[in-house]
């Protein structure tokens, strides 16, 4: 079956092994085996924000063991029972990830939870980013989840607590200085991030 018919068969579940074989030129994510089409290209503002955030984070992480990657970059999130990548039912392509454990990195991307995930909301992805992916990242132990809302010029930072749950978000607006509690020294001037 080709990926074009996948969206019509949402009751069927897929794995990373199947996903890796799809070659229709479209971008897909699998969340708990359910395919999500990622084909729509991000708008110019989205891309500008991503470039500014990634370059700023890379600057702070220079000479540290952490690596910054941005989409398309596969992040495989296995449940405890999946030893083989081919059986993993979840592979996502966040807008940006920071991985500090090089053992999680391979030629196909990242296997396991990144230290930080950033998603930039768009009309086509906001429900998934705020709902489905929030729960997914929390469940898999992503230490810090950043959600940027370009229209509101805001950033919400969720940090995982000792209970394995995200607590109340730290909210930031244009002009604020956002500080990571997970990546020492990483801070973003949101005036620069949202500049046109």
Locate predicted features:
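Gly/Pro/Ser/Thr-rich low-complexity, intrinsically disordered segments predominantly at protein N-termini
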Residues: 1-196
